[in-house]
Amino acid sequence: MPSCTSFPIGTRKSKLAVIQSEIIREELEKHYPHLEFPIISRDTIGDEILSKALFEFKRQLAKSLWTRELEALLVTNQCRILVHSLKDLPSEMPDGMVIACIPKRSCPLDAIVFKAGSHYKTVADLPPGSVVGTSSIRRRALLARNFPHLRFVDIRGNVGTRLAKLDAPDSQFDCLVLAAAGLFRLGLKDRIAQMLTAPFVYYAVGQGALAVEVRADDKEMIEMLKPLQHQETLYACLAERALMKRLQGGCAIPIGVQTDVLAISNSSYRISLLGTVLSADGLRAAFGNAEAVVSSEEEAEELGITVALALLKNGAGPILEEHQRSSDSEESLKNY
């Protein structure tokens, strides 16, 4: 028997975050119809500080931009679970916290959204000097690499805020780059003009997937979440996150991936993982890939590490060091 009848879910206050929490709540209610799963929302540092691009935050702070205030709810027992976009979670979880489950992944791709009424169909159609709105260093680097004639300007805020900025009569933006999964969940699929695919754009580690975080010692909740686990998604995302962890990457470093999964039995999957690391301007890039049959979490992580080592062998090291020097230099100037 459950220890109680109410298991609060913690999430950010944005419309998308609440919708994502409702997705998890609906799944839990299917399995536990006699229990309640109220949603508690909070703003995080990442929601409150909108004047900086994501890659401009100090590395240590960037790791908890979207999570620190929510994790306090777990520690104080105000919530039993937290629902996140997996791509917002650091590759190494804080002490005492674990990802209890990763449900089935939505579309991991990035999408182009043009200004309302625009006649353009693809990003390649944009004339020189056109302004692309994004605060992601990965998206900026990949698009600059393939479309050097474009300009990139930071844009922050929730999806609705960014779309309003795009569509404003005096907007400087010609288009935005957004995660397709978020647009789908918000019912905004009709705003998508183009899906960005490899070899032009590789998506973020964990993009399109949700993650449910709990306290590591909450064995009851971990057990209750097992029916929501999607094995194929879990293995793919574990491989991607192991790659990022080995490279010590985060939102301040342009790391992109593409993962293809083929089920070969009820418990085994053939996973192909390609990773890339780019300089901030996109002019230099390293690529690495590997394929393996995966039937355990350990094997999934081994695949990610293999691709990370291939990236380092193929020139990712100097690029990563350059990002680190740039980050250290900026921090030194701020502290001067």
From Swiss-Prot:
Modification sites for Phosphoserine: 327, 329
Signal peptide start and end residues: none
Superkingdom classification of source: Eukaryota
SUPFAM superfamilies from the UniProt entry: Periplasmic binding protein-like II, Porphobilinogen deaminase (hydroxymethylbilane synthase), C-terminal domain
InterPro entries cross-referenced by the UniProt entry: HemC, Porphobilin_deaminase_cofac_BS, Porphobilin_deaminase_N, Porphobilinogen_deaminase_C, Porphobilinogen_deaminase_C_sf
Annotated Gene Ontology cellular component terms: cytoplasm; nucleus
Pathway: Porphyrin-containing compound metabolism; protoporphyrin-IX biosynthesis; coproporphyrinogen-III from 5-aminolevulinate: step 2/4
Keywords on record: Heme biosynthesis, Phosphoprotein, Porphyrin biosynthesis, Transferase
Additional note from the record: The porphobilinogen subunits are added to the dipyrromethan group.
Protein name: Porphobilinogen deaminase
Species this protein is from: Schizosaccharomyces pombe (strain 972 / ATCC 24843) (Fission yeast)
Gene expressing this chain: hem3
